[in-house]
Amino acid sequence: MSGRGKQGGKARAKAKSRSSRAGLQFPVGRVHRLLRKGNYAERVGAGAPVYLAAVLEYLTAEILELAGNAARDNKKTRIIPRHLQLAIRNDEELNKLLGKVTIAQGGVLPNIQAVLLPKKTESHHKAKGK
């Protein structure tokens, strides 16, 4: 016999992605490839893409949760760029992180200067006093 065949030897274990090993949804392999191809450093460690993918996943989940809340507040079931804008600009830390970022079709935060608001009339209070 040639020594080749199904009998003998261990069966190869099912391949497991680095994302599933790390318990992530974001692609660790793709992040690793992009780090290598991007000329950020001569060498890229094995833990770096896992950490970066985890950070990206966390930030994405945080923004999507706040945007989902904004959509629900507006009685909508689909997140649109306006909801992303409201979520980011109303959160102090995310607004600082993404301060220079422009979101297409995001609009602006509703804001009216206090001096432009109508003044409360005092005649109502004087009438009660008499």
From Swiss-Prot:
SMART domains: H2A (SM00414). The modification Phosphothreonine is found at residue 121. Keywords: Acetylation, Chromosome, Citrullination, DNA-binding, Hydroxylation, Isopeptide bond, Methylation, Nucleosome core, Nucleus, Phosphoprotein, Ubl conjugation. The modification N-acetylserine is found at residue 2. Gene3D superfamilies: Histone, subunit A. Its main location: nucleus. Residues 1-22 are annotated as: Disordered. InterPro entries: Histone-fold, Histone_H2A, Histone_H2A/H2B/H3, Histone_H2A_C, Histone_H2A_CS. The modification N5-methylglutamine is found at residue 105. One of its GO terms (cellular component) is nucleosome. The modification Phosphoserine is found at residue 2. The keyword Acetylation applies. The modification N6-crotonyllysine is found at residues 37, 119-120, 126. The modification Citrulline is found at residue 4. It holds the Pfam family Histone_H2A_C. The modification N6-lactoyllysine is found at residue 10. The modification N6-glutaryllysine is found at residues 96, 100, 119-120, 126. The modification N6-(beta-hydroxybutyryl)lysine is found at residue 37. The keyword Membrane does not apply. The modification N6-succinyllysine is found at residues 10, 96. Belongs to the histone H2A family. Core component of nucleosome. Nucleosomes wrap and compact DNA into chromatin, limiting DNA accessibility to the cellular machineries which require DNA as a template. Histones thereby play a central role in transcription regulation, DNA repair, DNA replication and chromosomal stability. DNA accessibility is regulated via a complex set of post-translational modifications of histones, also called histone code, and nucleosome remodeling. This is Histone H2A type 1. It comes from Rattus norvegicus (Rat). The lineage of its organism: Eukaryota, Metazoa, Chordata, Craniata, Vertebrata.
